[in-house]
């Protein structure tokens, strides 16, 4: 974090211009492997890995490794090497039920100078000594070393990617321009090493990778979203999201269900209901987080009702000191599956 304050001052001092961000277009499908790489013409983008780890002694951990790329509203024609044309930041977190709180850390730097990079040819992200890249054999490898923890993991795809929405065009609001290009890789097989303090432990597990990029993501009424990604025990995969207004009412909703046979159902706004349940209140921020919702999903010929149970309640991640949001990102389980729940906009409206 040693360069964080100077970088934020630089961004604040940058002369804004009317940005010519690339639009999300429904007629532009996601194409793989091309779209594993960065899309610098768009305003924002992320590579989001979440998963569960199993330790040899039977212990469990949840983990998050996320890289973000953002294009600030500065003149991209500026010839200065110091112009913050692209900024890379990253979050990493470890959920330990024995500890009852997250370990987490973050990094941020402008692209260039050998400090940070997001390659366009394929997934190849670097930020200081943190990294996430896709190898020629299709496996992903990541290294992050945070405050009291480290992750060195190999993520092996076992299923085809899910192109969310319509061939990867995922609408996020009533205006079709409120959308992202979005695909997911569920059921990644995890192997590697977990570091906790001075101890190094071999781990295995299952993870989920979300890839998303956009220039206009949220409706002006939206304050945040709820997102749920579940790897089901039978090989199915469930993605759900809800964009909320200030009264907690849905602005938009959607997701996908791919069953164990590989049949994909794209979910419409009326197919997805998040019922909050009893909230957990953070002792640090005072924010009430609905960490145990019940989700109701309407599928062809049946209705799926799942109660979400967090690995433990306190999985709040406060990245505001790095210019990021306050959010809850935690390992959760449902009958017949495990995954991650993300909650944003409960402490303050999310700015995107």
Q: Could you say what each language-model-derived stretch is?
A:
Residues 2-3, 211:
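Basic side chains
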Residues 16-352:
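Structured soluble/peripheral alpha/beta segments that form catalytic or ligand/cofactor-binding pockets
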């Amino acid at each position: 974090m040693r360069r964080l304050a100077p970088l934020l001052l630089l961004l604040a001092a940058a002369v804004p211009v009317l940005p010519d961000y690339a639009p999300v277009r429904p007629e532009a499908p996601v194409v793989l492997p091309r779209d594993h790489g960065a899309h610098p013409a768009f305003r924002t983008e992320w590579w989001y890995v979440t998963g569960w780890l199993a330790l040899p002694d039977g212990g469990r951990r949840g983990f998050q490794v996320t890289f973000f790329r953002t294009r600030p509203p500065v003149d991209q024609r500026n010839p200065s090497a110091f112009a913050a044309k692209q900024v890379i930041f990253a979050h990493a977190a470890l959920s330990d039920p024995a500890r009852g709180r997250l370990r987490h850390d973050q990094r941020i730097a402008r692209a260039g100078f050998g400090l940070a990079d997001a390659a366009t040819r394929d997934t190849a992200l670097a930020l200081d000594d943190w990294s996430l890249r896709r190898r020629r054999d299709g496996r992903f490898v990541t290294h992050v070393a945070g405050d009291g923890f480290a992750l060195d993991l190999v993520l092996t795809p076992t299923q085809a990617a899910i192109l969310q929405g319509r061939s990867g065009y995922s609408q996020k609001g009533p205006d079709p321009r409120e959308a992202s290009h979005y695909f997911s890789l569920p059921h990644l097989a995890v192997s590697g090493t977990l570091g906790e303090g001075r101890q190094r432990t071999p781990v295995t597990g299952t993870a989920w990778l979300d890839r998303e990029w956009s220039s206009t993501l949220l409706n002006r009424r939206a304050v945040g979203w709820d997102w749920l990604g579940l790897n089901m025990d039978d090989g199915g995969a469930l993605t759900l999201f809800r964009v909320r207004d200030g009264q907690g009412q849905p602005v938009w909703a959607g997701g996908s269900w791919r069953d164990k046979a590989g049949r994909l159902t794209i979910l419409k706004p009326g197919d997805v209901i998040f019922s909050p349940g009893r909230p957990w209140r953070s002792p640090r921020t005072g924010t009430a987080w609905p960490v145990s919702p019940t989700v109701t999903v309407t599928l062809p010929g049946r209705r799926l009702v799942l109660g979400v149970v967090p690995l433990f309640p306190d999985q709040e991640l406060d990245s505001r000191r790095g210019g990021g949001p306050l959010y809850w990102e935690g390992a959760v389980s449902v009958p017949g599956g495990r995954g991650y729940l993300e909650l944003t906009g409960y402490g303050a409206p999310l700015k995107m």
